[in-house]
């Protein structure tokens, strides 16, 4: 299968179902997408081999883990040379509270999503972790009030 052009409607149905219920048994998946089990299994393997499915993951409940607050942080670095960008990105990857981090265009250099336990947990994260990473000139933060949509990946 080629990138996207190789996906037919059945492939898309398989991806949509697996995106929500990755632990479904093949028989159940086949029933949901209107195939018999053998062709369904073949299609799933083909989607995996072609790179459409990277992995199967458990989405953890942040609140149950004591990290019920999501904070979006925008960061501007004091320098923009390759070394600084690489070191800052590596440092972010090592911080356990960081759920996602993006190098971006625009007013800020990085968009970072973190999970913390309230304002005290966020203050601790800033003081003990993020602000110890060298090179930050400015940051701006917003607490997420409510998650309206969360998808790991869209299906065209």
What is each stretch, according to the model?
Residues 1-156:
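A compositional/biophysical signature of low hydrophobicity enriched in polar/charged and small residues
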């Amino acid at each position: 299968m080629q990138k996207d052009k190789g996906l037919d409607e059945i492939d898309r149905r398989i991806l949509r179902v697996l995106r929500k219920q990755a632990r479904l048994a093949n028989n159940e998946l086949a029933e949901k997408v209107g195939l018999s089990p053998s062709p369904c299994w073949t299609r799933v393997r083909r989607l995996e081999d072609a790179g459409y499915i990277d992995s199967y993951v458990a989405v953890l409940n942040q609140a149950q883990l004591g990290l019920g607050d999501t904070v979006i942080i925008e960061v501007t670095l004091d320098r923009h040379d390759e070394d600084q960008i690489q070191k800052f990105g590596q440092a972010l990857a090592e911080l356990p509270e960081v759920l996602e981090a993006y190098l971006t265009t625009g007013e800020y250099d990085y968009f970072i999503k973190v999970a913390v336990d309230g304002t005290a947990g966020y203050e601790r994260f800033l003081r003990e972790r993020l602000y110890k990473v060298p090179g930050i000139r400015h940051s701006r933060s917003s607490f997420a009030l409510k998650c309206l949509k969360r998808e790991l990946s869209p299906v065209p």
